[in-house]
A protein has these predicted regions:
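Conserved catalytic motifs of ABC-family nucleotide-binding domains
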Residues: 163
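Helix-to-loop junction immediately C-terminal to a conserved catalytic motif
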Residues: 51
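Conserved ABC transporter NBD signature motif
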Residues: 59-66, 79
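Conserved ABC ATPase "signature" region
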Residues: 113-138, 183-186
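The feature captures the beta-strand-to-loop junction immediately N-terminal to the Walker
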Residues: 36-38
């Protein structure tokens, strides 16, 4: 089976602190893989390197066979490789559906333009994904009024809005109550 992600001998330091040293791993298409380690062991740094947030010091990162280690975040995202964050990145003053619409990859445009011509299918897709993560009943609520766990579910739905080929989840269950966690895992 072909690997969707290949990380080869990747290292990243901040000043004198070595966050990642010669990390190598590959992930097959369609697999769910867990990266486990204590706090401060470099998991988030590796995620940031894979999606282009941190340039690597050496090594190689290939996504679908294409070297991506020199590419900027938006280009890597357009290739279908996305991540969520330990801290949620939502628009607190906007409702859940609007958050979903903004996250759609066509949203490099101004907000006014985004909201002035939303295809019905896009709104339906947003509502279906909100239903998938259990937030359909709260779709008209301001995102800032959701619990932390619900905000993480919203962020997951926002990432899925772009149908990524690969989604890196950074601490997806931190701060979420166990009932919601079981919903995510299902």
């Amino acid at each position: 089976k072909m690997s969707i992600l290949e990380v080869n001998n990747v290292s990243k330091s901040f000043g004198g602190v070595k966050a990642n040293v010669d990390i190598s791993m590959s992930v097959e298409k369609g697999k769910i893989v867990g990266l486990i380690g204590p706090n401060g062991s470099g998991k988030t740094t590796l995620f940031n390197s894979i999606v282009g947030t941190y340039p690597i010091d050496n090594g190689s990162i290939k996504f679908n066979g294409k070297e991506v280690s020199e590419l900027p975040v938006p280009v890597i995202a357009k290739l279908g490789l996305l991540r969520t964050f330990q801290q949620t990145r939502i628009y607190g003053k906007l409702n859940c559906v609007d958050n979903m619409l903004i996250s759609h990859k066509g949203s490099d445009e101004s907000l006014f333009k985004i909201f002035s011509k939303i295809p019905k299918e896009l709104t339906e897709k947003a509502e279906n994904l909100l239903n998938f993560v259990g937030l359909y009943q709260k779709r008209k609520l301001r995102a800032g009024d959701l619990s932390f766990g619900q905000q993480k579910l919203l962020e997951l739905a926002m990432a899925l809005m772009n149908e990524p080929e690969m989604l890196l989840l950074d601490e997806p269950t931190a701060g979420i109550n166990p009932t919601l966690i079981n919903g995510i895992i299902d």
